[in-house]
C-alpha cells in the first residue's frame, strides 16, 4: 500500500464557483450561462411584454400589440423613432428619465431586446464551446452557430448603425420583418446583390443536402433489428455502423458519376454550405449598411429610357423598386414629409 503525504491545496473562491457552475445537473449552467440565461430571459421577456402591451403609435403611427387588436403575425416590438438616432435609450437616460411609460413610448424596448438578444445568442455560442471542451469533442457546433450570430448582429445592429438611426432596423415581429425585406429590396435592390445570391444558395443548398443525406441514410440502413420501424430497430449503444457508406457511395456514383468518398468530407461539406451562406449574406448586409451598390446595369437603364420598346427584367425590377420606394417612404417615414403625386400614393384598404 502506498500512502501519499502532502499539504492539502487551498481552494479559492474561483475554484468553488467553477465547481458549482460546472456541476452535473439537468440544465448545465457553466460560465457561459452567466451571460446566456439572464440575457435570453430579459430578451424574450421584453419581447413578450412588447407584443402584448406596448403600442408603436408614437414611433411608427401603428398598432403593434395584442392589447390593440394585433395577432401573433402582426404584433411587434417596434424600432425607436428616427429622431432618437443611435441612442441606447436607457431607462434612466436623458430621453426617458426613469419614466417607464415614456420609455415604452419612445421605443426603448427595442434596444433592450436587440442588445440582450445579441448577447444571448453569443452566450449560446460560448455555451457550445464550453460544453464541447468539457465533453472532449471538437467545437464545430459553435463554429456553425456563428452563422446565425453573424446574421442577427449585422441585420439588427450593424445595418441601422450604418443608417440614420435604429428606426431603419427591422422591428421584432413577423409582418415587421416582411416590411423590412420589402424595404431592403426597394431601397437597396437586395435580391440582385451577389452576397444575397450566395446566401440563398447556401441556405437552400444546405436544406437540399440535409434532405439527400437523410434519405440516403434511411435507404442504406443495416437491417440488424427485428422491429417494425427505424426508431425501434436500433439501440443507442450499438457498436456497429448504422448504415452502409459503401452502398451510398455506389448509389450516388451511378446517379451523378461522382460521390463523397468518406463521411468526414461529406459532413464537413454539409456544415460548410449553409454556414458560408449565412456569412456571405451577413457580409452583404454590412455593404447595405454603408449604402454600397451591387449590380447597377446603367447601360440598360439608359437604353430603356431612350427606347420605349427596349425592356429587360432588370429594368422592370427597377420600376418595381421605384414603386416600393414611393409607396413605402411616405407612410414609413412620415417625419421626412415626402411629397409624391396623389396617383402613386398608397390608398389604404381601397386597393
From Swiss-Prot:
Its main localization is: plastid
* Key words of the record: Chlorophyll, Chloroplast, Chromophore, Electron transport, Iron, Magnesium, Membrane, Metal-binding, Oxidoreductase, Photosynthesis, Photosystem II, Plastid, Thylakoid, Transmembrane, Transmembrane helix, Transport
Give a GO molecular function annotation for the protein: chlorophyll binding
Origin, by domain of life? Eukaryota
Name the family. Answer: Belongs to the reaction center PufL/M/PsbA/D family.
Mind giving the lineage of the organism this protein is from?
A: Eukaryota, Haptista, Haptophyta, Prymnesiophyceae, Isochrysidales
Per UniProt, Fe cation binds at 213, 267
Positions that bind chlorophyll a PD2: 196
Protein name, entry field: Photosystem II D2 protein
Reactions it catalyzes: 2 a plastoquinone + 4 hnu + 2 H2O = 2 a plastoquinol + O2
Provide the binding site for chlorophyll a ChlzD2.
116
Functionally, this protein is described as follows:
Photosystem II (PSII) is a light-driven water:plastoquinone oxidoreductase that uses light energy to abstract electrons from H(2)O, generating O(2) and a proton gradient subsequently used for ATP formation. It consists of a core antenna complex that captures photons, and an electron transfer chain that converts photonic excitation into a charge separation. The D1/D2 (PsbA/PsbD) reaction center heterodimer binds P680, the primary electron donor of PSII as well as several subsequent electron acceptors. D2 is needed for assembly of a stable PSII complex.
Which Gene Ontology cellular component terms are annotated?
chloroplast thylakoid membrane; photosystem II
Single biological process term from Gene Ontology: photosynthetic electron transport in photosystem II
Which NCBIfam families does this entry report, sorted A to Z?
psbD
State the oligomer form and interacting partners: PSII is composed of 1 copy each of membrane proteins PsbA, PsbB, PsbC, PsbD, PsbE, PsbF, PsbH, PsbI, PsbJ, PsbK, PsbL, PsbM, PsbT, PsbX, PsbY, PsbZ, Psb30/Ycf12, at least 3 peripheral proteins of the oxygen-evolving complex and a large number of cofactors. It forms dimeric complexes.
Q: Where in the cell is it found?
A: Plastid, Chloroplast thylakoid membrane
Naturally occurring in which organism (per UniProt): Emiliania huxleyi (Coccolithophore)
Topologically, how does it sit relative to the membrane?
Answer: Multi-pass membrane protein
Where along this sequence does the record place binding of a plastoquinone? 213, 260
Enzyme group, top EC level? oxidoreductase
The free-text cofactor remark is: The D1/D2 heterodimer binds P680, chlorophylls that are the primary electron donor of PSII, and subsequent electron acceptors. It shares a non-heme iron and each subunit binds pheophytin, quinone, additional chlorophylls, carotenoids and lipids. There is also a Cl(-1) ion associated with D1 and D2, which is required for oxygen evolution. The PSII complex binds additional chlorophylls, carotenoids and specific lipids.
Tell me the residue numbers annotated for binding pheophytin a: 128, 141
Amino acid at each position: 500500500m502506498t500512502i501519499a503525504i502532502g499539504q492539502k491545496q487551498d481552494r479559492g473562491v474561483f475554484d468553488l464557483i467553477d465547481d458549482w457552475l460546472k456541476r452535473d445537473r439537468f440544465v448545465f449552467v457553466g460560465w457561459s450561462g452567466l451571460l446566456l440565461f439572464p440575457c435570453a430571459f430579459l430578451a424574450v421577456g421584453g419581447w413578450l411584454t412588447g407584443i402584448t402591451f406596448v403600442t408603436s403609435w408614437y414611433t411608427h403611427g401603428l398598432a403593434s400589440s395584442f392589447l390593440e387588436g394585433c395577432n401573433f403575425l402582426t404584433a411587434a416590438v417596434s424600432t425607436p423613432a428616427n429622431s432618437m438616432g443611435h441612442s441606447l435609450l436607457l431607462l434612466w437616460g436623458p430621453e426617458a428619465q426613469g419614466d417607464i411609460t415614456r420609455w415604452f413610448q419612445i421605443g426603448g424596448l427595442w434596444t433592450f431586446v436587440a442588445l440582450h438578444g445579441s448577447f444571448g445568442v453569443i452566450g449560446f455560442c460560448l455555451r457550445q464551446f464550453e460544453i464541447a471542451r468539457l465533453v472532449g469533442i471538437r467545437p464545430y457546433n459553435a463554429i456553425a452557430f456563428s452563422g446565425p450570430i453573424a446574421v442577427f448582429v449585422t441585420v439588427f445592429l450593424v445595418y441601422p448603425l450604418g443608417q440614420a438611426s435604429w428606426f431603419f432596423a427591422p422591428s421584432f415581429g413577423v409582418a415587421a420583418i416582411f416590411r423590412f425585406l420589402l424595404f431592403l429590396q426597394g431601397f437597396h435592390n437586395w435580391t440582385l446583390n451577389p452576397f444575397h445570391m450566395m446566401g440563398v444558395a447556401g441556405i437552400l443548398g444546405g436544406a437540399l443536402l440535409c434532405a439527400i443525406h437523410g434519405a440516403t441514410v434511411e435507404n442504406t440502413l443495416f437491417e440488424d433489428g427485428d422491429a417494425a420501424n427505424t426508431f425501434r430497430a436500433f439501440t443507442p449503444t450499438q457498436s456497429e455502423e448504422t448504415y452502409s457508406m459503401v452502398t451510398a457511395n455506389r448509389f450516388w456514383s451511378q446517379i451523378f458519376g461522382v460521390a463523397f468518398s468518406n463521411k468526414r468530407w461529406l459532413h464537413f461539406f454539409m456544415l460548410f454550405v449553409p454556414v458560408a451562406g449565412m456569412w456571405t449574406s451577413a457580409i452583404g448586409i454590412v455593404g447595405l449598411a454603408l449604402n454600397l451598390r451591387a449590380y447597377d446595369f446603367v447601360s440598360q437603364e439608359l437604353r430603356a429610357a431612350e427606347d420605349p420598346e427596349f425592356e429587360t427584367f432588370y429594368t422592370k425590377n427597377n420600376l418595381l423598386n421605384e414603386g416600393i420606394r414611393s409607396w413605402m417612404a411616405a407612410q414609413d417615414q412620415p417625419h421626412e414629409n415626402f411629397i409624391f403625386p396623389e396617383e402613386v400614393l398608397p390608398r389604404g384598404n381601397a386597393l
